[in-house]
Protein backbone atom coordinates (compact mmCIF):
# COMPACT_ATOMS: atom_id res chain seq x y z
CA UNK A 1 0.00 0.00 0.00
CA UNK A 2 0.93 3.64 -0.48
CA UNK A 3 -0.48 5.03 2.80
CA UNK A 4 0.95 4.24 6.18
CA UNK A 5 -2.45 5.22 7.60
CA UNK A 6 -6.06 5.39 6.44
CA UNK A 7 -7.30 7.44 3.52
CA UNK A 8 -10.66 7.70 5.29
CA UNK A 9 -13.65 9.21 3.46
CA UNK A 10 -11.56 11.96 1.87
CA UNK A 11 -8.90 9.78 0.22
CA UNK A 12 -8.54 10.64 -3.49
CA UNK A 13 -6.24 10.15 -6.49
CA UNK A 14 -5.50 12.71 -9.25
CA UNK A 15 -3.43 12.57 -12.42
CA UNK A 16 -1.77 15.79 -13.58
CA UNK A 17 -3.69 16.82 -16.75
CA UNK A 18 -0.41 17.84 -18.41
CA UNK A 19 1.65 14.78 -17.40
CA UNK A 20 0.25 11.25 -17.29
CA UNK A 21 3.19 10.05 -15.16
CA UNK A 22 2.51 12.62 -12.44
CA UNK A 23 0.11 11.29 -9.80
CA UNK A 24 -1.15 12.87 -6.58
CA UNK A 25 -2.88 10.92 -3.83
CA UNK A 26 -4.04 12.16 -0.47
CA UNK A 27 -5.99 11.42 2.66
CA UNK A 28 -4.19 11.99 5.94
CA UNK A 29 -0.88 12.70 4.12
CA UNK A 30 -0.48 14.16 0.62
CA UNK A 31 1.85 12.21 -1.69
CA UNK A 32 3.02 12.45 -5.28
CA UNK A 33 4.65 10.16 -7.82
CA UNK A 34 6.78 11.17 -10.81
CA UNK A 35 6.94 7.70 -12.35
CA UNK A 36 3.34 6.67 -12.84
CA UNK A 37 2.91 5.30 -9.33
CA UNK A 38 6.02 3.15 -8.97
CA UNK A 39 7.29 5.31 -6.12
CA UNK A 40 5.66 7.98 -3.98
CA UNK A 41 6.98 10.68 -1.67
CA UNK A 42 5.37 13.23 0.66
CA UNK A 43 5.04 16.86 -0.32
CA UNK A 44 3.37 18.21 2.82
CA UNK A 45 5.52 20.65 4.80
CA UNK A 46 5.52 22.01 8.34
CA UNK A 47 2.97 24.73 7.51
CA UNK A 48 0.60 22.27 5.79
CA UNK A 49 -2.04 20.59 7.93
CA UNK A 50 -2.83 16.88 7.66
CA UNK A 51 -6.14 15.43 6.42
CA UNK A 52 -6.32 16.58 2.82
CA UNK A 53 -9.76 16.94 1.26
CA UNK A 54 -9.22 18.48 -2.16
CA UNK A 55 -6.54 19.41 -4.67
CA UNK A 56 -6.55 21.69 -7.71
CA UNK A 57 -3.80 21.13 -10.28
CA UNK A 58 -3.08 23.97 -12.69
CA UNK A 59 -3.28 22.40 -16.18
CA UNK A 60 -1.18 25.21 -17.66
CA UNK A 61 1.54 25.49 -15.01
CA UNK A 62 3.03 22.23 -13.65
CA UNK A 63 3.69 22.34 -9.93
CA UNK A 64 1.06 24.98 -9.19
CA UNK A 65 -1.31 23.35 -6.70
CA UNK A 66 -4.06 24.54 -4.36
CA UNK A 67 -4.73 22.16 -1.49
CA UNK A 68 -7.71 22.16 0.88
CA UNK A 69 -7.07 20.46 4.20
CA UNK A 70 -8.17 20.47 7.82
CA UNK A 71 -6.05 23.58 8.38
CA UNK A 72 -7.58 25.58 5.54
CA UNK A 73 -5.97 26.32 2.17
CA UNK A 74 -2.33 25.99 1.04
CA UNK A 75 -0.81 27.05 -2.28
CA UNK A 76 2.44 25.92 -3.91
CA UNK A 77 4.12 26.94 -7.17
CA UNK A 78 6.98 24.41 -7.02
CA UNK A 79 5.16 21.11 -6.57
CA UNK A 80 5.21 21.14 -2.79
CA UNK A 81 8.77 22.21 -2.09
CA UNK A 82 7.37 25.40 -0.55
CA UNK A 83 3.83 26.21 0.49
CA UNK A 84 1.94 29.43 1.25
CA UNK A 85 -0.71 29.18 3.98
CA UNK A 86 -3.80 31.21 3.08
CA UNK A 87 -5.39 32.80 6.16
CA UNK A 88 -7.60 35.31 4.35
CA UNK A 89 -10.88 33.47 4.93
CA UNK A 90 -12.20 32.52 8.36
CA UNK A 91 -13.12 28.85 8.05
CA UNK A 92 -12.76 27.55 11.62
CA UNK A 93 -15.00 24.59 12.42
CA UNK A 94 -15.92 25.09 16.07
CA UNK A 95 -17.53 22.28 18.03
CA UNK A 96 -18.01 24.33 21.19
CA UNK A 97 -17.23 27.79 22.58
CA UNK A 98 -17.16 29.53 25.95
CA UNK A 99 -16.18 32.84 27.57
CA UNK A 100 -14.53 34.08 30.74
CA UNK A 101 -15.14 37.29 32.69
CA UNK A 102 -11.79 39.01 32.48
CA UNK A 103 -11.58 42.55 31.14
CA UNK A 104 -11.49 42.41 28.22
CA UNK A 105 -13.02 38.97 28.29
CA UNK A 106 -11.63 36.03 26.33
CA UNK A 107 -13.40 33.65 24.00
CA UNK A 108 -12.46 29.96 23.98
CA UNK A 109 -13.28 27.29 21.45
CA UNK A 110 -12.56 23.75 20.34
CA UNK A 111 -12.05 23.26 16.61
CA UNK A 112 -12.20 20.27 14.32
CA UNK A 113 -8.62 18.95 14.09
CA UNK A 114 -7.19 22.34 15.08
CA UNK A 115 -7.11 22.07 18.85
CA UNK A 116 -8.43 24.52 21.43
CA UNK A 117 -7.83 28.25 21.06
CA UNK A 118 -8.47 31.35 23.14
CA UNK A 119 -8.30 35.06 22.44
CA UNK A 120 -9.69 38.47 23.42
CA UNK A 121 -13.21 39.13 22.21
CA UNK A 122 -12.27 42.59 20.92
CA UNK A 123 -9.37 41.56 18.71
CA UNK A 124 -9.92 42.89 15.19
CA UNK A 125 -9.58 40.77 12.08
CA UNK A 126 -6.54 42.19 10.29
CA UNK A 127 -3.07 41.23 9.11
CA UNK A 128 -1.11 43.52 11.45
CA UNK A 129 0.05 40.50 13.43
CA UNK A 130 2.10 39.45 10.38
CA UNK A 131 4.22 42.54 11.04
CA UNK A 132 4.31 42.47 14.84
CA UNK A 133 4.49 38.71 15.29
CA UNK A 134 1.89 39.01 18.05
CA UNK A 135 -1.17 37.02 17.04
CA UNK A 136 -3.95 37.84 19.54
CA UNK A 137 -5.29 34.26 19.66
CA UNK A 138 -3.27 31.31 20.94
CA UNK A 139 -3.67 27.56 20.93
CA UNK A 140 -3.83 25.92 24.36
CA UNK A 141 -4.34 22.26 23.36
CA UNK A 142 -4.08 20.08 20.27
CA UNK A 143 -6.12 17.34 18.61
CA UNK A 144 -9.77 17.78 17.74
CA UNK A 145 -10.61 20.54 20.21
CA UNK A 146 -13.75 19.96 22.22
CA UNK A 147 -15.71 21.62 25.00
CA UNK A 148 -14.23 24.22 27.35
CA UNK A 149 -15.04 25.13 30.95
CA UNK A 150 -13.34 27.98 32.81
CA UNK A 151 -13.07 28.33 36.60
CA UNK A 152 -14.86 31.59 37.38
CA UNK A 153 -12.67 32.12 40.46
CA UNK A 154 -9.40 31.74 38.55
CA UNK A 155 -9.62 32.05 34.75
CA UNK A 156 -6.17 30.46 34.40
CA UNK A 157 -7.77 27.12 35.31
CA UNK A 158 -9.33 25.72 32.14
CA UNK A 159 -10.88 22.31 31.54
CA UNK A 160 -10.78 21.15 27.95
CA UNK A 161 -9.67 18.28 25.76
CA UNK A 162 -9.89 16.40 22.53
CA UNK A 163 -12.04 13.65 21.04
CA UNK A 164 -13.43 10.67 22.96
CA UNK A 165 -13.13 12.12 26.45
CA UNK A 166 -9.43 12.92 26.65
CA UNK A 167 -9.85 15.97 28.87
CA UNK A 168 -7.24 17.84 30.89
CA UNK A 169 -7.11 20.51 33.54
CA UNK A 170 -4.86 23.31 32.33
CA UNK A 171 -3.18 25.95 34.44
CA UNK A 172 -2.48 28.69 31.91
CA UNK A 173 -0.47 30.61 34.47
CA UNK A 174 2.07 27.90 35.23
CA UNK A 175 1.73 25.91 32.01
CA UNK A 176 0.91 22.73 33.95
CA UNK A 177 -1.47 20.18 32.51
CA UNK A 178 -3.15 17.18 34.18
CA UNK A 179 -5.16 14.47 32.45
CA UNK A 180 -8.57 14.06 34.09
CA UNK A 181 -10.30 11.41 31.95
CA UNK A 182 -12.29 8.99 34.14
CA UNK A 183 -11.14 5.35 34.00
CA UNK A 184 -13.14 2.18 34.58
CA UNK A 185 -12.28 -0.19 37.39
CA UNK A 186 -10.51 -3.48 36.81
CA UNK A 187 -13.08 -6.03 35.65
CA UNK A 188 -15.56 -3.40 34.46
CA UNK A 189 -16.43 -2.81 30.83
CA UNK A 190 -14.62 0.23 29.42
CA UNK A 191 -16.59 3.46 29.41
CA UNK A 192 -17.97 4.67 26.09
CA UNK A 193 -17.12 8.30 25.29
CA UNK A 194 -18.74 10.33 22.54
CA UNK A 195 -16.52 12.03 19.96
CA UNK A 196 -17.58 15.34 21.55
CA UNK A 197 -17.65 14.29 25.18
CA UNK A 198 -19.66 16.76 27.31
CA UNK A 199 -18.08 18.35 30.37
CA UNK A 200 -19.61 20.81 32.85
CA UNK A 201 -18.40 22.82 35.83
CA UNK A 202 -21.20 23.16 38.35
CA UNK A 203 -22.51 26.74 38.50
CA UNK A 204 -22.94 26.21 42.25
CA UNK A 205 -19.44 24.96 43.09
CA UNK A 206 -16.45 25.40 40.80
CA UNK A 207 -14.69 22.41 42.39
CA UNK A 208 -17.48 20.14 41.15
CA UNK A 209 -17.03 18.81 37.63
CA UNK A 210 -19.33 16.57 35.58
CA UNK A 211 -18.28 14.48 32.57
CA UNK A 212 -20.34 12.09 30.48
CA UNK A 213 -19.43 8.69 29.03
CA UNK A 214 -22.30 6.20 29.04
CA UNK A 215 -22.38 7.05 32.76
CA UNK A 216 -22.41 10.47 34.39
CA UNK A 217 -19.20 11.01 36.34
CA UNK A 218 -18.77 13.55 39.14
CA UNK A 219 -15.62 14.98 40.67
CA UNK A 220 -15.54 17.17 43.77
CA UNK A 221 -11.87 18.13 43.25
CA UNK A 222 -11.77 19.39 39.66
CA UNK A 223 -11.10 16.01 38.09
CA UNK A 224 -8.48 14.52 40.41
CA UNK A 225 -10.94 11.79 41.45
CA UNK A 226 -14.22 10.58 39.97
CA UNK A 227 -17.31 8.72 41.06
CA UNK A 228 -20.12 7.37 38.91
CA UNK A 229 -23.41 8.96 39.95
CA UNK A 230 -25.60 7.03 37.51
CA UNK A 231 -26.11 3.70 35.84
CA UNK A 232 -25.70 3.45 32.07
CA UNK A 233 -27.94 6.28 30.81
CA UNK A 234 -28.10 4.97 27.23
CA UNK A 235 -29.67 2.01 25.46
CA UNK A 236 -26.28 0.31 25.29
CA UNK A 237 -23.42 0.30 22.84
CA UNK A 238 -23.35 -0.81 19.22
CA UNK A 239 -20.48 -2.19 17.19
CA UNK A 240 -18.79 0.29 14.89
CA UNK A 241 -15.65 2.31 14.30
CA UNK A 242 -16.69 4.91 16.92
CA UNK A 243 -18.40 4.45 20.30
CA UNK A 244 -22.19 4.58 20.31
CA UNK A 245 -24.57 4.64 23.23
CA UNK A 246 -22.91 7.70 24.77
CA UNK A 247 -23.90 10.84 26.66
CA UNK A 248 -23.90 13.92 24.42
CA UNK A 249 -25.12 16.76 26.64
CA UNK A 250 -25.25 17.70 30.35
CA UNK A 251 -27.01 20.60 32.07
CA UNK A 252 -27.41 21.52 35.73
CA UNK A 253 -30.06 23.93 36.93
CA UNK A 254 -28.39 27.22 37.86
CA UNK A 255 -31.22 27.72 40.36
CA UNK A 256 -31.18 24.39 42.23
CA UNK A 257 -27.98 22.47 42.86
CA UNK A 258 -28.20 18.77 42.00
CA UNK A 259 -30.97 19.10 39.40
CA UNK A 260 -29.18 17.54 36.44
CA UNK A 261 -30.28 16.63 32.92
CA UNK A 262 -28.43 14.24 30.62
CA UNK A 263 -29.07 13.38 26.95
CA UNK A 264 -27.55 10.65 24.78
CA UNK A 265 -26.85 9.85 21.14
CA UNK A 266 -29.63 7.25 21.11
CA UNK A 267 -32.44 9.52 22.22
CA UNK A 268 -32.41 8.95 25.97
CA UNK A 269 -33.01 11.87 28.35
CA UNK A 270 -32.73 11.49 32.12
CA UNK A 271 -33.15 13.82 35.09
CA UNK A 272 -32.07 13.65 38.71
CA UNK A 273 -33.29 16.09 41.35
CA UNK A 274 -30.98 14.86 44.08
CA UNK A 275 -27.50 14.96 42.61
CA UNK A 276 -27.61 11.49 41.07
CA UNK A 277 -29.08 9.41 43.89
CA UNK A 278 -32.09 8.58 41.71
CA UNK A 279 -32.74 9.10 38.00
CA UNK A 280 -35.91 9.27 35.89
CA UNK A 281 -36.17 8.58 32.16
CA UNK A 282 -38.04 11.59 30.72
CA UNK A 283 -37.90 10.71 27.01
CA UNK A 284 -41.16 8.74 26.92
CA UNK A 285 -43.40 11.14 24.96
CA UNK A 286 -40.65 12.41 22.65
CA UNK A 287 -39.63 11.22 19.16
CA UNK A 288 -37.53 8.13 19.74
CA UNK A 289 -33.96 7.11 18.88
CA UNK A 290 -32.79 10.56 17.75
CA UNK A 291 -29.54 12.25 18.73
CA UNK A 292 -29.99 14.56 21.74
CA UNK A 293 -28.05 17.59 20.55
CA UNK A 294 -28.68 19.84 23.55
CA UNK A 295 -30.46 19.98 26.89
CA UNK A 296 -30.65 23.33 28.69
CA UNK A 297 -31.93 23.99 32.21
CA UNK A 298 -33.67 27.35 32.59
CA UNK A 299 -31.96 30.34 34.21
CA UNK A 300 -35.30 31.62 35.51
CA UNK A 301 -37.44 28.67 36.59
CA UNK A 302 -36.20 25.57 38.38
CA UNK A 303 -38.79 23.34 36.69
CA UNK A 304 -38.25 24.54 33.11
CA UNK A 305 -35.91 22.77 30.70
CA UNK A 306 -35.35 22.98 26.93
CA UNK A 307 -34.34 20.19 24.59
CA UNK A 308 -33.27 19.80 20.96
CA UNK A 309 -33.07 16.56 18.98
CA UNK A 310 -31.19 15.95 15.75
CA UNK A 311 -32.26 13.45 13.10
CA UNK A 312 -30.03 14.28 10.14
CA UNK A 313 -28.08 11.02 10.51
CA UNK A 314 -31.31 9.27 9.56
CA UNK A 315 -32.12 11.72 6.72
CA UNK A 316 -34.61 13.45 9.00
CA UNK A 317 -34.15 17.22 8.87
CA UNK A 318 -37.19 18.25 10.93
CA UNK A 319 -36.56 20.84 13.66
CA UNK A 320 -37.11 19.05 16.96
CA UNK A 321 -37.33 21.56 19.82
CA UNK A 322 -39.19 21.09 23.10
CA UNK A 323 -39.93 22.80 26.40
CA UNK A 324 -40.94 21.22 29.69
CA UNK A 325 -42.31 23.08 32.70
CA UNK A 326 -42.22 20.11 35.06
CA UNK A 327 -38.66 18.75 35.03
CA UNK A 328 -39.26 16.85 31.78
CA UNK A 329 -42.32 14.91 32.91
CA UNK A 330 -44.19 16.25 29.87
CA UNK A 331 -42.88 18.05 26.81
CA UNK A 332 -44.40 20.58 24.41
CA UNK A 333 -43.01 21.23 20.93
CA UNK A 334 -41.85 24.83 20.43
CA UNK A 335 -40.40 24.43 16.93
CA UNK A 336 -43.48 26.23 15.49
CA UNK A 337 -42.34 28.09 12.33
CA UNK A 338 -38.68 27.04 12.36
CA UNK A 339 -37.46 25.78 8.96
CA UNK A 340 -36.50 22.19 8.26
CA UNK A 341 -32.94 22.14 9.53
CA UNK A 342 -31.32 20.16 12.35
CA UNK A 343 -31.13 22.11 15.63
CA UNK A 344 -27.75 21.89 17.32
CA UNK A 345 -28.16 24.17 20.33
CA UNK A 346 -30.83 26.03 22.30
CA UNK A 347 -30.24 28.55 25.08
CA UNK A 348 -32.41 30.88 27.13
CA UNK A 349 -31.66 34.55 27.55
CA UNK A 350 -30.18 35.24 30.97
CA UNK A 351 -32.14 38.52 31.42
CA UNK A 352 -35.49 37.96 29.70
CA UNK A 353 -37.06 34.53 30.24
CA UNK A 354 -39.30 34.93 27.17
CA UNK A 355 -36.33 35.12 24.80
CA UNK A 356 -34.78 31.96 23.34
CA UNK A 357 -31.99 31.50 20.82
CA UNK A 358 -31.35 28.41 18.70
CA UNK A 359 -28.56 27.49 16.33
CA UNK A 360 -29.29 25.18 13.41
CA UNK A 361 -27.38 24.09 10.31
CA UNK A 362 -28.08 27.42 8.59
CA UNK A 363 -27.80 30.10 11.28
CA UNK A 364 -29.40 31.58 14.39
CA UNK A 365 -33.09 32.12 15.19
CA UNK A 366 -34.66 34.07 18.04
CA UNK A 367 -38.02 33.86 19.81
CA UNK A 368 -39.52 36.59 22.00
CA UNK A 369 -42.37 34.41 23.28
CA UNK A 370 -40.75 31.19 24.56
CA UNK A 371 -40.90 29.48 21.20
CA UNK A 372 -44.41 30.28 20.01
CA UNK A 373 -42.90 32.13 17.03
CA UNK A 374 -39.38 32.44 15.65
CA UNK A 375 -37.51 35.04 13.62
CA UNK A 376 -34.20 34.76 11.74
CA UNK A 377 -31.39 36.43 13.68
CA UNK A 378 -28.57 36.32 11.18
CA UNK A 379 -28.03 39.65 9.46
CA UNK A 380 -24.27 39.84 9.00
CA UNK A 381 -23.94 36.16 9.84
CA UNK A 382 -22.66 33.97 7.03
CA UNK A 383 -24.80 30.90 6.37
CA UNK A 384 -23.09 28.12 8.29
CA UNK A 385 -23.93 25.40 10.77
CA UNK A 386 -24.15 26.91 14.26
CA UNK A 387 -22.93 24.40 16.82
CA UNK A 388 -22.82 26.51 19.96
CA UNK A 389 -24.17 29.71 21.53
CA UNK A 390 -23.05 31.43 24.72
CA UNK A 391 -23.92 34.75 26.37
CA UNK A 392 -21.28 36.92 28.05
CA UNK A 393 -23.60 38.35 30.66
CA UNK A 394 -21.62 41.41 31.76
CA UNK A 395 -21.11 42.78 28.24
CA UNK A 396 -24.49 41.51 26.99
CA UNK A 397 -22.88 39.77 24.02
CA UNK A 398 -24.10 36.69 22.19
CA UNK A 399 -21.22 34.57 20.85
CA UNK A 400 -22.00 32.28 17.93
CA UNK A 401 -19.75 29.28 17.28
CA UNK A 402 -20.09 28.05 13.70
CA UNK A 403 -18.78 24.84 12.21
CA UNK A 404 -17.22 26.35 9.10
CA UNK A 405 -17.02 30.14 9.48
CA UNK A 406 -15.47 30.60 12.95
CA UNK A 407 -17.01 32.80 15.68
CA UNK A 408 -19.40 35.76 15.47
CA UNK A 409 -20.41 38.29 18.14
CA UNK A 410 -23.67 40.22 18.52
CA UNK A 411 -24.54 42.94 21.04
CA UNK A 412 -27.90 41.88 22.50
CA UNK A 413 -28.42 44.68 25.05
CA UNK A 414 -31.45 46.02 23.17
CA UNK A 415 -32.89 42.56 22.70
CA UNK A 416 -32.56 41.76 26.39
CA UNK A 417 -34.55 44.89 27.21
CA UNK A 418 -37.24 43.91 24.72
CA UNK A 419 -40.82 44.24 25.97
CA UNK A 420 -44.30 43.77 24.59
CA UNK A 421 -44.62 47.50 23.81
CA UNK A 422 -41.92 47.08 21.16
CA UNK A 423 -43.93 44.38 19.43
CA UNK A 424 -47.15 46.42 19.44
CA UNK A 425 -45.65 49.64 18.11
CA UNK A 426 -45.21 50.03 14.35
CA UNK A 427 -41.87 51.75 14.95
CA UNK A 428 -39.95 52.33 18.16
CA UNK A 429 -36.81 54.49 18.31
CA UNK A 430 -34.65 53.81 21.34
CA UNK A 431 -32.80 56.45 23.33
CA UNK A 432 -29.44 57.49 21.91
CA UNK A 433 -26.25 58.29 23.74
CA UNK A 434 -25.12 61.87 24.26
CA UNK A 435 -22.41 63.15 21.92
CA UNK A 436 -19.62 65.39 23.18
CA UNK A 437 -18.33 68.03 20.78
CA UNK A 438 -14.72 67.75 19.61
CA UNK A 439 -12.52 70.29 17.82
CA UNK A 440 -11.26 67.37 15.71
CA UNK A 441 -14.56 67.05 13.84
CA UNK A 442 -14.04 67.74 10.15
CA UNK A 443 -10.24 67.68 10.38
CA UNK A 444 -7.58 65.25 9.27
CA UNK A 445 -3.89 64.93 10.03
CA UNK A 446 -2.71 64.45 6.46
CA UNK A 447 -3.97 64.20 2.91
CA UNK A 448 -3.86 60.40 2.90
CA UNK A 449 -6.12 60.03 5.96
CA UNK A 450 -9.90 60.37 5.96
CA UNK A 451 -11.57 63.27 7.74
CA UNK A 452 -12.39 62.65 11.40
CA UNK A 453 -16.16 62.46 11.64
CA UNK A 454 -18.37 61.80 14.66
CA UNK A 455 -20.91 59.01 14.64
CA UNK A 456 -24.18 58.42 16.40
CA UNK A 457 -25.99 55.08 16.21
CA UNK A 458 -29.79 54.98 16.18
CA UNK A 459 -31.55 51.75 17.14
CA UNK A 460 -35.01 51.26 15.65
CA UNK A 461 -37.49 48.41 16.04
CA UNK A 462 -39.91 48.01 13.14
CA UNK A 463 -42.98 45.80 13.12
CA UNK A 464 -42.61 45.20 9.38
CA UNK A 465 -40.21 45.71 6.48
CA UNK A 466 -40.85 48.95 4.62
CA UNK A 467 -39.42 52.24 3.35
CA UNK A 468 -39.29 55.16 5.77
CA UNK A 469 -38.02 58.71 6.07
CA UNK A 470 -35.29 59.28 8.65
CA UNK A 471 -35.14 62.88 9.91
CA UNK A 472 -33.12 64.66 12.58
CA UNK A 473 -35.06 67.59 14.11
CA UNK A 474 -33.90 70.04 16.78
CA UNK A 475 -35.94 71.54 19.59
CA UNK A 476 -37.16 74.33 17.29
CA UNK A 477 -38.57 71.75 14.84
CA UNK A 478 -35.88 72.57 12.27
CA UNK A 479 -35.03 69.62 10.00
CA UNK A 480 -31.27 69.16 10.25
CA UNK A 481 -30.98 65.97 8.25
CA UNK A 482 -33.29 63.86 6.10
CA UNK A 483 -32.74 60.54 4.36
CA UNK A 484 -34.84 57.75 2.88
CA UNK A 485 -34.12 54.41 4.55
CA UNK A 486 -35.24 50.79 4.27
CA UNK A 487 -36.31 49.17 7.54
CA UNK A 488 -36.24 45.42 8.04
CA UNK A 489 -38.72 43.68 10.28
CA UNK A 490 -37.14 43.67 13.73
CA UNK A 491 -34.16 45.67 14.93
CA UNK A 492 -32.39 48.14 12.65
CA UNK A 493 -29.26 50.18 13.29
CA UNK A 494 -28.51 53.47 11.52
CA UNK A 495 -25.21 55.31 11.75
CA UNK A 496 -25.54 59.11 11.54
CA UNK A 497 -22.37 61.21 11.16
CA UNK A 498 -23.94 64.44 12.51
CA UNK A 499 -23.91 66.23 9.15
CA UNK A 500 -26.74 68.70 8.52
CA UNK A 501 -28.54 69.85 5.39
CA UNK A 502 -27.01 72.78 3.50
CA UNK A 503 -30.35 74.59 3.54
CA UNK A 504 -31.17 73.87 7.19
CA UNK A 505 -32.57 77.09 8.67
CA UNK A 506 -30.49 77.24 11.86
CA UNK A 507 -27.92 79.48 13.44
CA UNK A 508 -24.76 77.46 14.00
CA UNK A 509 -23.54 80.06 16.48
CA UNK A 510 -26.40 79.35 18.91
Locate each region found by the language model.
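Extracellular acidic loop/turn motifs
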Residues: 18-20, 255, 465, 501-504
